[in-house]
Amino acid sequence: MEDLNYGSIRIKLDEMIKKQGISKNKLAHRAEMQRTQLNQFCKGTVTRLDTAVLARLCYALDCKIEDLLEYIPPENK
């Protein structure tokens, strides 16, 4: 079976945090999430995106989902 590349999702949370000038501790509190989970989002190491967490982040940062996520299409072979 051929190994297909569908592209990837880039998480831009770290950029939003810097842009808004909010601390990670404050954001974690506002979004009701653990600091370690927030760090995984910032580093792009989270393996499963939880829509409830994404909604809380959008609410806490007063932003849209496209401000946090970007689809990177696959490179042509």
Where are these regions (language model features)?
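A short, Lys/Arg-rich alpha-helix, primarily the initiator
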Residues: 1-21
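Short, charged recognition helix plus adjacent turn
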Residues: 2-3, 69-77
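Short alpha-helical elements of helix-turn-helix
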Residues: 9-11, 50-54
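Residues within the helices of the helix-turn-helix
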Residues: 14, 25, 55
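The alpha-helix within a helix-turn-helix
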Residues: 17, 28, 58
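Helix-turn-helix/winged-helix DNA-binding modules
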Residues: 19, 46-49, 60
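DNA major-groove recognition helix of helix-turn-helix/homeodomain DNA-binding modules
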Residues: 52-67
